[in-house]
Amino acid sequence: MERARRLAMLGRLVSQTKHNPSISSPALCSPSRYVSSLSPYVCGGTNVRSDRNLNGFGSQVRTISVEALKPSDTFPRRHNSATPEEQTKMAEFVGFSNLDSLIDATVPKSIRLDSMKYSKFDEGLTESQMIAHMQDLASKNKIFKSFIGMGYYNTSVPTVILRNIMENPGWYTQYTPYQAEIAQGRLESLLNFQTMITDLTGLPMSNASLLDEGTAAAEAMAMCNNIQKGKKKTFIIASNCHPQTIDICKTRADGFDLKVVTSDLKDFDYSSGDVCGVLVQYPGTEGELLDYSEFIKNAHANGVKVVMASDLLALTILKPPGELGADIVVGSAQRFGVPMGYGGPHAAFLATSQEYKRMMPGRIIGVSVDSSGKPALRMAMQTREQHIRRDKATSNICTAQALLANMAAMYGVYHGPEGLKTIAKRVHGLAGTFAAGLKKLGTVQVQDLPFFDTVKVTCADSKAIAEEACKHKMNLRIVDKNTITVAFDETTTIEDVDTLFKVFALGKPVPFTAASIAPEVQDAIPSGLVRETPYLTHPIFNMYHTEHELLRYISKLQSKDLSLCHSMIPLGSCTMKLNATTEMMPVTWPAFADIHPFAPTEQAQGYQEMFKNLGDLLCTITGFDSFSLQPNAGAAGEYAGLMVIRAYHMARGDHHRNVCIIPVSAHGTNPASAAMCGMKIITVGTDSKGNINIEELRKAAEANKENLSALMVTYPSTHGVYEEGIDEICKIIHDNGGQVYMDGANMNAQVGLTSPGWIGADVCHLNLHKTFCIPHGGGGPGMGPIGVKKHLAPYLPSHPVVPTGGIPAPEESQPLGTIAAAPWGSALILPISYTYIAMMGSQGITNASKIAILNANYMAKRLENHYPILFRGVNGTVAHEFIVDLRPLKTTAGIEPEDVAKRLIDYGFHGPTMSWPVPGTLMIEPTESESKAELDRFCDALISIRQEIAEIEKGNVDFNNNVIKGAPHPPQLLMADKWTKPYSREYAAYPAPWLRAAKFWPTTCRVDNVYGDRNLICTLQPPQEYEEKAEATA
């Protein structure tokens, strides 16, 4: 009634306004998008009509338009930050009459799309409609109790971790911790992860996560090859390894001409002298628990390195692989409090000895000191990574699964060593009780080998037993027609064991219960494999076992890290855009989170429908014919795309085509990925405008015409411009027998305006964690699905357990192999991109690209009088990112990009991408979801810093001792008793007026990178060592 009364009053007011303009109200008829949801009723003059006088009050009766009845919770206006009025004003500031004229001048006409239209969700779903749609999909998934195992297990995710990390934008919107001074929280958590891994594996070095267990095993295989300097070309894999791991290793080995042999342990043969390494599983994929001590001694005696894939929960009670003699240990931390999620994302790990530290893939966190000498954390040994060493890098892996590693680390912190041991013993006890019960039943045969959590059963008809289990909503693993395995986990109950007895009884009565026979069950672990070495002894793993304490610890770490909750993160080529809450919500729904990746597909029809819809939408957006959702990172997508091209050439008999042309401006992952595929890399330069030198490219293509495999190109270029000759570049490659691989890192400037397929690319990976809104998670997760033209679709990756391929499926299939451990990669985070695309609609997502370009050009225009803008397109505009040239400042003021980035921290900002793709520069990418006010604030900060630099150039402040060289300035430095700086504390802390209202504070002074690598420490140190260092510098 109240709403009706208000509407009537507003109607009369509008009617009076129409007949008496002198009382018009701008507030009511403002075109702003911020007008309330009532605005359609009160601003639509065309809907007002005169009618008869009612009750003598002169009331006007009005019709209501259909538009007024549409839902008001549309999404594009929440994601695309600039209002229409701001768009016009910003375009005018840049020198154009409106947004569209700017876009016309920026995107080459030769590649411009007239329009893009979705076949589904074209107008975009509202947020409430999207939630309802996702709930409908979720209802089509069936949650069965999983006993499949094979590296994936149900787990009880502590709700304090679920709510305060996985669902917390303060954790999931952070970027990779390149700016260590504003990342000490997640760096500490990742150091906890590394410490947990080293303690449990018994090896001294661990990285901060890898993509999945299978990928980690493939990386370990590559390490073995590198350790042997490529002189031994055979790698043996034990048949007791997970099938997906075996297939991933086989696929990876093709790229560097390594022969993979799968064999039973008893048949291993080193007599050829050509074996670089072996891979074994501990415990085995079918549950068997073997003592590898003598096996490893024999391998070492033959000069062979041993990789062991292991299970973290098992290692809490089993002798660690390091003590058995393993050289490298890999595995997954999924069962440490991370949902199965139909395959991921999960944090894998790789641990090894100090001897091989520089051959390790992935990020590694190390302990260093800051400029005051106090302990501080940072990413260590970055010089071995792909963004520096390119094709000579240890791996193409960038950051991997930091968010999930943090969850697993907090799980370890929350439970502590005793809690983990209790969980492991309970799981082992349930498995033992089940095995004992089956022996009592006598209907099947139980394996005699010892086991940890997985029981192998021989039976007359495995399919019949599995079908009976399905009736009880349980999934078992069918190994073959006479073999089943049953894997137990943290969520299994004693009642589940009783149900399993009924399943295996095959109709016979069960004269006992699990509870009744449990006291008779003996530990199945041999005494020689029982763990005796303590682990997780550091206080951090023994302090936070109540929810209140862990909550405060999580909050304390979060407070040290800058995220999108605080300010824009304008990293070029990283696309740090809004990760909307509606997009994130389905990720933690049990109907998506609690499905095993190898569950029957009929139990995951909601997922399957989403995959189909998403594949169709991505094909529309990119101009491709089919997509694979399997690659679970951008780097994995690059590798997969190149392997598709390789498979295509092989199928045509062109085995010799192995030359890959790569511009010098390419992402470092490009040459690293090409090297992994066994390609010979030829680089081509750029011209003075930042474009690929087409004539140099033409000569390289023609000179290698017989052997040309591919070109890798990023569009728009990494220099932040739309190259006018991109269609000609594609034609040159095709005319010389090659395929065009497009790096999708800059797709945020293409969507709706052009497309890789339209331009002429044959294959492209998409960084869903950039363009399509999956959060960066402080260094992962990501997703890198690949789209291909029709002729490449048959070669898209498949999977040995659940066959997959292209979406839509091609007519024929000749899959290249397996890229990731799970059939659809990190399926759990695909709803994020799916909801973004569906809610934006074709027009909203096209406008996102336009506004991203507008924001970049606006910032470039604001900054151009203070810093040179290095590259522009033919009409003087930039794409969605641009490069600021700081090189002259090194000579005039001694200032380098790192100095500017550190001073930006004092202004409350994360620095842009430093010294890439051009050394001595900053690359800035604002994205479409940052407001004009935020853009202005960042520009003001950079302009203010330029004024500070000018003071150095004028000689007014010291060349080496100034506010920029001293940045950042944490509170402990500002509050110290002694202040010896030649500038005031106040100016160091508050260089801009907005900071007085709210400021993000760094927690350390500038971190010493060189010290950290020269004194490499990659695990938690005893507290007394930190205290001694702190006292020494006090």
From Swiss-Prot:
The glycine cleavage system catalyzes the degradation of glycine. The P protein binds the alpha-amino group of glycine through its pyridoxal phosphate cofactor; CO(2) is released and the remaining methylamine moiety is then transferred to the lipoamide cofactor of the H protein. GO terms for molecular function: glycine binding; glycine dehydrogenase (decarboxylating) activity; pyridoxal phosphate binding. InterPro entries: GcvP, GDC-P_C, GDC-P_N, GDC_P, PyrdxlP-dep_Trfase, PyrdxlP-dep_Trfase_major, PyrdxlP-dep_Trfase_small. This is Glycine dehydrogenase (decarboxylating), mitochondrial. The modification N6-(pyridoxal phosphate)lysine is found at K770. Homodimer. The glycine cleavage system is composed of four proteins: P, T, L and H. It is found in: Mitochondrion. Gene3D superfamilies: Aspartate Aminotransferase, domain 1, Type I PLP-dependent aspartate aminotransferase-like (Major domain). One of its GO terms (cellular component) is mitochondrion. PANTHER family: GLYCINE CLEAVAGE SYSTEM P PROTEIN, GLYCINE DEHYDROGENASE, DECARBOXYLATING. Keywords: Mitochondrion, Oxidoreductase, Pyridoxal phosphate, Transit peptide. Its cofactor is pyridoxal 5'-phosphate. The keyword NADP does not apply. Belongs to the GcvP family. One of its GO terms (biological process) is glycine decarboxylation via glycine cleavage system. It comes from Flaveria anomala (Yellowtops). The gene is GDCSP. It comes from the Eukaryota. Residues 1-63 form a transit peptide. The keyword tRNA processing does not apply.
